[in-house]
């Protein structure tokens, strides 16, 4: 009982459990004398022989049994009543578990709400990010449009500056030409005034001459009558008196008659009057000479001025016309950009989306596209303002042009027919030129195939015609047919040369035929049986001393 009282400070629920498990699991407790329960240890001392000690041991055993019964009785009662103790102390635990479940549910609901809010926020964030991206794309598009507008404005400003500079230069040229015309007119006016003065002075000179003649006739003696005297030869001028010479000149001269050339220098005059009269003769002649020179100079000057005027006018007209044409061209380009935007966008879509099954479709599409673009004022200047697929359009046009040229060559080779009326030299040269053209075209096609076939495939343009089994094969077959025509013409010419018995002509024709056959063999990779038969026929018509060498050559060709 003392052991139970010492452990009463712990709760009854725990104490009962501990006492139950301790009774079951713990070994027997020690006795008061310190001995543990269990098997007694053997000792060398025999207790049976000592009656006093034997009695004390028996008493101790009785006491320990009683104590054990006293200790185990309440423990057994507690173990029997344990479910009641558990029920008594287990009931208050139920509200604690309900509260924990409610808290768990509340925390779970709060976590769900938080999760939902997070999901809503994430959705809003995704929507906002998409809106931001769309706005950024719109901003970039607006920036590109703004840059294009700025570039177009810069180009228009440059064009306006050029036009203004051209106008300023044209005005400067016009003003300089007009300033050059003014001195010419002033010069002409001054010359006209000089001419008027000379004419007036010349009209005054006959009056002075008449007065001088009258005075000289008064001073001179009367001359004999001409009827009485025989006609005498004219005297030298230096022997004739000045008065008589003046009288005769005045009688024969009229105011409008041209003056005579000046006489040789006379001897010193005897009279001062004659000296004065002779001194008055030279100024009119010199003045007339100067007048004529001035007239000639004025004519030359007027012609040069007129020529300069015509040149200046033509230059001015050309400058003005060029400015007008340029301005009209720019206006037409601007009008096409503003009014034909839809039309050009439709063309862009067709170029990007059209698919082709063969090259015939490509040629038709390229022809149609060229006709549509021909309606623009300036194709390149207008299309650079749009997102024109220039690379694909150029590739389509390149493929169409190359295929058209090859098809034309193949048709020309296959449809060639020899005209016997044409001289054989001209006919053979024409066929050789066709073979040269075929070789050049095939080499060009091979280069184009190596450089552009990948781009053709990217743009979905047919490439079968570029292969060896396409146009190359057709052209080679046509060249073999051309070689057969060449051999037949050479054979005919050899027959005519045999009739004429010309060995040099035969040998030259043979060399030409074999050379052409060899070139065709190398180009086409062989000859057909008909061409080989024609070559054999040529070999049969060759002279005997040349037949062996040519036969070996023909064998190599076959």
Curated annotation (Swiss-Prot):
Cell compartments where the protein resides: Cytoplasm, Cytoskeleton
The keyword Membrane is annotated on this UniProt entry: no
Compositional bias per record (Pro residues), positions renumbered to this chain: 221-236, 256-272
Keywords: Coiled coil, Cytoplasm, Cytoskeleton
Segments of this protein annotated with the region Disordered: 1-54, 207-285
This protein's record includes keyword rRNA processing: no
Compositional bias segments (type: Low complexity): 1-15
Coiled-coil spans in chain: 104-180, 392-448
Top-level taxon: Eukaryota
GO molecular function: microtubule binding
InterPro entries given in the database record: CHUP1/IPGA1-like
Protein role: Microtubule-associated protein probably involved in the regulation of microtubule organization.
UniProt family annotation: Belongs to the IPGA1 family.
Protein name from the UniProt record: INCREASED PETAL GROWTH ANISOTROPY 1-like protein 2
Naturally occurring in which organism (per UniProt): Arabidopsis thaliana
Name of the encoding gene: IPGAL2
